[in-house]
């Protein structure tokens, strides 16, 4: 197969044209238009400072169906004891900066480069990218994650923790919040043992794209996300 070089227009080849490792295209930019076109097509950018922009569509793809969420006893205990408080869209730039600093075994640096941060901050301001913040009892950021929301699908980009299980607590609250709004699934993109431990499963690219098309039949939930009155306590009870 051929790896496509992108032109100025924010269009992509079909994901089925990707290489066996998932690499589909190279080049282009990180404009809001191109990024939204990518996510709507089941494609995401992932590269480092030594390479041009690379665009991927993996087969298989990792997703989380909400009824498969696994919450460990330890996380349940921390939720029950109110060790953390979870918010949305309160500190996006702090969350993505912490994700960029996160050490990842086997990687020499980070793929969340300055231009990547700038691009996702723009999408956050447009209401398409959202952050989850996890605060400890002292009011300090203990963990979090961020991702892209289109239609009824949330594509998780990265998560971090500064205290044990903080990101798992945030992810668990997010999943319940999305479920309450009839989202269809979370796109976890790349298979990792960590995400699989939370209940994520691999599906074929073909099935993923069918699920994505169905989820995109609904309008995006743009703007600042927040819990409805009484919802936070309800989710806390569910997760406990």
From Swiss-Prot:
Q: Name one GO cellular component term.
A: cytoplasm
Subcellular localization:
Cytoplasm
Query: What Gene Ontology terms describe what this protein does at the molecular function level?
Result: leucyl-tRNA--protein transferase activity
Q: Provide the catalytic activity annotation.
A: N-terminal L-lysyl-[protein] + L-leucyl-tRNA(Leu) = N-terminal L-leucyl-L-lysyl-[protein] + tRNA(Leu) + H(+); N-terminal L-arginyl-[protein] + L-leucyl-tRNA(Leu) = N-terminal L-leucyl-L-arginyl-[protein] + tRNA(Leu) + H(+); L-phenylalanyl-tRNA(Phe) + an N-terminal L-alpha-aminoacyl-[protein] = an N-terminal L-phenylalanyl-L-alpha-aminoacyl-[protein] + tRNA(Phe)
Domain of life here? Bacteria
- Has keyword Zinc? no
Q: Which Gene3D superfamilies match?
A: Leucyl/phenylalanyl-tRNA-protein transferase, C-terminal domain, Leucyl/phenylalanyl-tRNA-protein transferase, N-terminal domain
Q: What class of enzyme is it?
A: transferase
Under Enzyme Commission nomenclature, its number is 2.3.2.6
Gene Ontology BP terms: protein catabolic process
Q: Which Pfam families match?
A: Leu_Phe_trans
Alphabetically ordered keywords of this record? Acyltransferase, Cytoplasm, Transferase
- Tell me where the transmembrane regions lie: none
Among PANTHER family, the record links this protein to:
LEUCYL/PHENYLALANYL-TRNA--PROTEIN TRANSFERASE (PTHR30098), LEUCYL_PHENYLALANYL-TRNA--PROTEIN TRANSFERASE (PTHR30098:SF2)
| General function of this protein | Functions in the N-end rule pathway of protein degradation where it conjugates Leu, Phe and, less efficiently, Met from aminoacyl-tRNAs to the N-termini of proteins containing an N-terminal arginine or lysine.
Cross-referenced NCBIfam families, in alphabetical order?
aat
Q: Which family does it belong to?
A: Belongs to the L/F-transferase family.
**Record-given protein name:** Leucyl/phenylalanyl-tRNA--protein transferase
Q: Which organism is it from?
A: Maridesulfovibrio salexigens (strain ATCC 14822 / DSM 2638 / NCIMB 8403 / VKM B-1763)
Traced from the root, the source organism's taxonomic lineage reads:
Bacteria, Pseudomonadati, Thermodesulfobacteriota, Desulfovibrionia, Desulfovibrionales
